[in-house]
Amino acid sequence: MKMTFRWYGENVDPIPLRYIRQIPGVEGIVWALHDIPAGECWTVERIEEVKAQAAKYNFNTDVVESVNVHEDIKLGLPSRKKYIENYKNTLKNLGRAGVKVVCYNFMPVFDWTRTDLYKPQSDGSTALFYEKAKVDNINPVKFLEQMSKQEGLLTMPGWEPERLSKIKELFEAYKEIKDDDLWENLKYFLQEIIPVAQESGIKMAIHPDDPPWSIFGLSRIITCRDNIKKFLSLVDNPSNGLTLCSGSLGSCTKNNIAAIVREFGDRIYFAHIRNIRHFKNGDFTETSHKTSDGSLDITEIVKAYHDINYKYYVRPDHGRHIWDEKCRPGYGLYDRSLGIMYIFGLWDAFEKISASKRGQYGVE
């Protein structure tokens, strides 16, 4: 596996590249041009600018997260053709710059949803939290206004001001969009962009819906093993693949993440590893990466990646906010660094076990 770390950019991310360089084993940064609105083309000049910044610290820029999909594409509007052309041109420019994987999602309106960005934990840290009853019983416009106030100055990906400013219009537009419609619009998008991605040497890696169920009446389709299989069959091409986020899919107790890794491993081009703890009422909180701290068996998930000889990209996903760090919700330096060390510790242990079985450590 190739370890990476998500970075929001110079003068934007409070974590400088020189700090990330000090985390053992990190080979690349996961990046994006967050200031460019969805639907606009990324220029070669802007892409090369980030590459140069990363190169100063010997980081690769192989993985982009995300090139956001314009809502008109998800809605299947006639204007989608313009935005798809821009998307294709962005992929061509990224391919020329050596980008290998592009993460994206097809969630209507906004990305991952939580009700509390800084929920106090028993150990004194804070973490992202999802309260089911609150989501089920609040007006989405009011909910998003409350969440924006929690963000402070560090906006979350998928909750950009230009998107939220049109929230009422978007919810109105999605009233008639059911699961089948979203599937059809996704298929159209894939049929258009996957050939371009393949020609550009890029693996497209869709991110699961977070959480993996309908919220506020909006469709969610990348939610489970069966839907992942359906997704991959829409355009059965090696350039059409997955970002497997353990925390997103793992929010649903029916999803067996390790089994999904073993079944679809050859199409998983990007892995997000994090842990969450479920509550009986449908709530969940994010935790440290340690298996015993949450409800997901991170040990077994990492073992599944090791067993399939996973060669692609990994990053620690959302961490807690610890040691009074002032950071973007879920994206602090300290707990994600601890997560990397935990993942590496598990991986190294499985490497030793495998070597022992082969007799390389004198164990017959």
UniProtKB/Swiss-Prot annotation:
Its cofactor is Fe(2+); Mn(2+). The keyword Manganese applies. Coiled coil: none annotated. It catalyses: D-mannonate = 2-dehydro-3-deoxy-D-gluconate + H2O. Its EC number is 4.2.1.8. It comes from the Bacteria. Keywords: Iron, Lyase, Manganese. GO terms for biological process: D-glucuronate catabolic process. It is an enzyme of class 4 (lyase). Pathway: Carbohydrate metabolism; pentose and glucuronate interconversion. It holds the Pfam family UxuA. One of its GO terms (molecular function) is ferrous iron binding. Catalyzes the dehydration of D-mannonate. Belongs to the mannonate dehydratase family. This is Mannonate dehydratase. The gene is uxuA.
